[in-house]
């Protein structure tokens, strides 16, 4: 998955089941025809013309963990567990605001990928349970 650089409220999500764009502004999900390159880690679709959208996930890549506003997420691992014969550690993700205040936003088995949109107004996380989106609401 990856956020559009030109349209930062649009998130491309590619799975074995389907390819979609999630609109972080209105919550709509649109099925798309997209092509992606697992080596270059980019996706293209006619829904986001003239753009190679960077993607990250099971094949590599990384979404940004910092915002232009000075916020960030910090990822750490704790408590080993054996699940289906594999040793896994719980992953904890902490959101740190620009003043240094910390809030735990995720504790679970490791996510596949997470990160902010280019404008820092959306945060997405994908794990075995699905895709989770947090959106900044300015009052």
Where on the chain are the PLM-derived regions?
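WD40-repeat beta-propeller superdomains and closely related acidic/aromatic-rich repeat-like regions
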Residues: 1-139
